[in-house]
């Protein structure tokens, strides 16, 4: 049997160990889980549960999205996090030999009628929580209403363009 003073000490030590263990386990559970292994068609790359493909033949924003829709659940890419932005930027930098911006699935169907550039959304209907504007469209005197990855930012920031401009594009789809 433990002396009466030993039991509170032992309880305190046990409680401290349990608290430390829960913190360590909590840190591990917050890390991103490894992506599911998916098979993507030739010419595309997997990231998490989607396939991504860069198309070098320039098209208007609408024609590019129509081309992307030929793939299962396909649209111009929606960039939902900084990690996904880095993946897409790397895909573009490693496969494109032109000095061009790249269409993404961001657009403003209100054509600027909502205050503070509030009309911007993803064509895929994903929620626009992550933003990476090179220059806020609300600060531009004559903005375009379709989004692109900016070459000058290493494809890590967004820029608005006239939707009828012909640019290469990235599709995001399932397969």
UniProtKB/Swiss-Prot annotation:
Disulfide pairings: 40-51, 68-171, 146-163
One GO cellular component term: extracellular space
Leader sequence segment: 1-26
C-type lectin domain ranges (all copies): 38-173
Biological process, per Gene Ontology: antimicrobial humoral immune response mediated by antimicrobial peptide; positive regulation of cell population proliferation; response to peptide hormone
Entry comment describing in which tissues the protein is expressed: In pancreatic acinar cells.
Keyword annotations: Disulfide bond, Lectin, Secreted, Signal
Localisation per UniProt entry: Secreted
Function description: Might act as an inhibitor of spontaneous calcium carbonate precipitation.
Protein name: Lithostathine
